[in-house]
Amino acid sequence: MKRIVIVLAALAFACGLDAQELTIIHFNDTHSHVDPQRSGDYVGRGGAIEHAAFIDSVRFASGKKNVLLVHAGDYGQGTSYFTELQGNIEIDVMNSLGFDVVCLGNHEFDNGTVELARRLKNLDAEVVCANYDFTGSPLEGLVKRCTVVKRAGKKIGFIGLLTDIRRVVDKNIADEFKFLDPAEVANELAEYLKKEKGCDMVICLSHLGYEEDKEVAASMRNVDLIIGGHSHTLLHKKQTVKDLDGKDVVIVQNWKWGLNAGELKIRF
């Protein structure tokens, strides 16, 4: 597994003698790759054991209270673990690793919403997805539009965004709920998180894809960081897009299959 470290000094807020450093470990599109790669160019790389060792080392070095572990969607589907065990082992692995916040990816819906709801009931992490109305579906009450987590003495707000699944999921599943405009919803919730909840930082966990992340970022306010997925894009360094107020929105994404681990260091 390759470790990609990005220091977001540009997000420093009033750095001084009492400055805090938050570390965010992020994955996306792991697609049920619980084991290391068994063949090909990346044989032996990735897998839950390697991930656990890396995560534990970061928590030990930085202090668990200063570390967040997040996933930007599509943790399931892609190996026989999903097809044979109905997505159960992925939930067990994520619980063992101690994920804090997860957003939904389109492949989470592959077995239908009843099965997804069953799995999410067993997931310890907060699950966020803001741009769908799940009212009346099995996911109602299991998925939040946004959430707040305290780490490194700061309040971090999370918003989840998901691609239009009508393009990639069975129509009978996609028609169970309503798709909402990602930028419009993100702006509403980001303002709420900053002004009403007093968040020091607002992060979008996005399963829109890199190109759409850039488009949405340009239509946002009050969002500091987008941790992306869906397009399996490998970004070796941060990308920035100016928002509606001319402020930089940082975008990161971490390829696929758990071959890389993203590590963001944010100084406040």
Which stretches of residues belong to each language-model region?
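Sec-dependent N-terminal signal peptides
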Residues: 4-13
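Sec/Tat signal peptide C-region and signal peptidase I cleavage site
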Residues: 13-19
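Acidic, metal/ion-coordinating pockets
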Residues: 19-268
